[in-house]
Amino acid sequence: GLNTLKKVIQGLHEVIKLVNNHA
C-alpha cells in the first residue's frame, strides 16, 4: 500500500544521502 511505498521512498532518500556524502 501507500505506507510501503512511503517507506521505500524514504529508504531511497537515505541511500541517496549516503551516496552523495561519499561522492
UniProtKB/Swiss-Prot annotation:
A GO CC term assigned to this protein in UniProt: extracellular region
Keyword set, alphabetical order: Amidation, Amphibian defense peptide, Antibiotic, Antimicrobial, Immunity, Innate immunity, Secreted
Modification type Alanine amide: residues: A23
Tissue expression per record: Expressed by the skin glands.
Gene Ontology biological process: defense response to Gram-negative bacterium; defense response to Gram-positive bacterium; innate immune response; killing of cells of another organism
Cross-referenced InterPro entries: Antimicrobial_19 (IPR013156)
Subcellular localization(s) per the UniProt record: Secreted
Keyword set includes Secreted: yes
Family recorded in the similarity comment: Belongs to the frog skin active peptide (FSAP) family. Pseudin subfamily.
Function: Antimicrobial peptide with activity against both Gram-positive and Gram-negative bacteria. Has been tested against X.axonopodis pv. glycines (MIC<2 uM), E.coli ATCC 25922 (MIC=6 uM), S.aureus ATCC 29313 (MIC=6 uM) and P.aeruginosa ATCC 27853 (MIC=50 uM).
Listed name of the protein: Pseudin-B
